[in-house]
Amino acid sequence: MTVAPFDAKALAQGLEQGAQALRLELTAVQQQQLLQHLALIDRWNRVYNLTAVREPAQMLTQHLLDSLAVVAPLRRQTRATAIALLDVGSGAGLPGVAIAVACPEIHVSCVDTVSKKASFIRQVGVELGLTHFQALHARVESLASSNFDVITSRAFASLADFVTLTEAALAPDGVWMAMKGQVPHEEMAVLPSSIEVFHVEPLQVPGLDAERCIVWMHRKG
C-alpha cells in the first residue's frame, strides 16, 4: 500500500482549521510543536509501529485533533490551574503530548509498558522542548501514591479496569477522564460501587465522522 507523503503545508492548514473549530487559541510555536509531534510519529512509525494509522492526514484527524478535542473540557474541569495529569497507555503520546503543548500549566506524565513507545514519547518531549513533561516506562500499578489530579486514557482498557488499575495513583479529590467512542453504557454499568460517573461529555472532532465522548469519573463521597 502506498502511503501519502508528509505534506507539512496541508497538515498545518488542517491543524489551524481544526483548532479554530475546537475554539482553541494556539500560538505559532504550539502549532509547530504539534506538527513536529505528527512528523515524529510518521517517521518513527515506519520502524516502531506506533499506530495502525499510516496516512499523515488521517493521523492529524484521528490522533492529533482527537486529542486536542479534550483540551477545552479539561480546562473547564480543572479551571485552567496547574495540575498533574497522567496519560495511561500513552502509545505515541496521545493525548498526553497534545495536552502538554496546549496546556503548559499542566504537568503531564505519559506512561506505557512498551519500552519503544516510552522511548519515543521521551524523545518527543526532548525535541519539542516540553517542560513539565515526562515519559515513563512502567506499569501504572507502580505509580501508587503519585497523587495525580487527573488520570486519562485514550485506548487503554474498559472503564472498570481503567479505574481499578489506576486508583492508587489518583489524588483523593482527583478525577478520571476516559476518552471513548460511543457512550459505553455497559462499561459504566459494571463500574466498582465506589466509583461514580459524574458527567458524560460529547465531543465533536473536526473531520472525524464518528462518535466521541469523555466519561468523567470520581470516587463517591
Curated annotation (Swiss-Prot):
Catalytic activity: guanosine(527) in 16S rRNA + S-adenosyl-L-methionine = N(7)-methylguanosine(527) in 16S rRNA + S-adenosyl-L-homocysteine
Binding site for S-adenosyl-L-methionine: G89, L94, V140, E141, R154
EC annotation from Swiss-Prot or TrEMBL: 2.1.1.170
GO molecular function: rRNA (guanine-N7-)-methyltransferase activity
Localization per Swiss-Prot or TrEMBL: Cytoplasm
Enzyme kind, highest EC tier: transferase
Source superkingdom: Bacteria
Purpose: Specifically methylates the N7 position of guanine in position 527 of 16S rRNA.
Name by which UniProt lists this protein: Ribosomal RNA small subunit methyltransferase G
Organism encoding this protein: Methylibium petroleiphilum (strain ATCC BAA-1232 / LMG 22953 / PM1)
Gene: rsmG
